[in-house]
Amino acid sequence: MPEISIITTFYDAVDYLPLTVKAILDSTFTDFELLLIDDGGPNDCGKICDILAETDPRIRVFHKKNGGPASAANVGLKNARGRYIATVDSDDIIEPTMLETLYRQIQESGCPMAACAGDCIDGQGNPLPGYNPVVCSLTGKIDALELFRDAFSTGSFYGPLSWNKLIDIRLFRDRGILYDEKMFYGDDASVLHRVFEGQTIYCTNQFLYHYRSRQGSMTALTFNPRKLDDLTMYYDWVQFFAARPQYAEIYRLGLKRFWQVYYLFYHQAVQAGKMADCHQAFAPHFEHLKELSRPLLAQCGLSIGEKLRLRLFLFNPALAYKLARLRGNLSK
């Protein structure tokens, strides 16, 4: 059996998938299988993968009806034969040494997981200026849940992402964890806190993963109501840490981040002219914001001005936003 299973799901990446597959096959670590999951895409990606599979026995192709990224990733989880799993998005590029580096860090540290840094490239593979790299303020061997301290305090998604990690597959299977198929965005991040609990991870800021941002891709769109999945994810994280007093500081940071992300999405929806379309989608998250408002106001060290804005927002979001516009303080 292979030591590592690499899961790559795809729907509409015909221009980039061959480059992604080539980068994986060029890895210096060779004891792996590559699972290509065709999520019922509209173009020839599935046929391309079948052709690629004929050129390298390490490639296994799975075709399925379209069900979203989480359902495709779960096909990979269920069929992986390796001791460790890695995920590579269908339009991204990994360094040849990524698998070797993360595997070595796991073996040397005794951690069941390892993670690296990532940066953003454009459609031609060139570095994109102005995009914050995915790095971590914590390095070396750490409590894996401490990655959420970094995520909540810096905004970096180094911790909650799957694509920059190599993970012992038993952390999924022994706990019965699968990706959340109700989530369109953040399907991997929405479950990793459960994978991390009670575990350690070795973190490095070596840039071994290159994330592609292209016009029209899910993550490049200015605002999409499906992004509100992130608020569900943040709420679940807050509830998770609320039940674990030993992580009280991370809980408080998570509360504050939930409010910041909610307000940011509200701002983006208004700026994109999508608020009328998104009003209904915001409703359950507004209820969560009201539910969390008491500890937010009491425990998170908000300034007097921020407390006033939160109280006004809870009373009348549109009015609070209009006042913020008059003051020139919209997105913070």
Residue ranges and their predicted role:
Residues 64-80:
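Glycine-rich, basic loop-to-helix element that forms the pyrophosphate-binding segment
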Residues 206-214, 220-249, 260-293:
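Catalytic core of nucleotide-sugar-dependent glycosyltransferases
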Residues 271-332:
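Membrane-interface aromatic/basic loop that binds lipid-linked glycans or pyrophosphate carriers
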Residues 93-202, 216-225:
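Donor-binding/catalytic cores of nucleotide-activated saccharide
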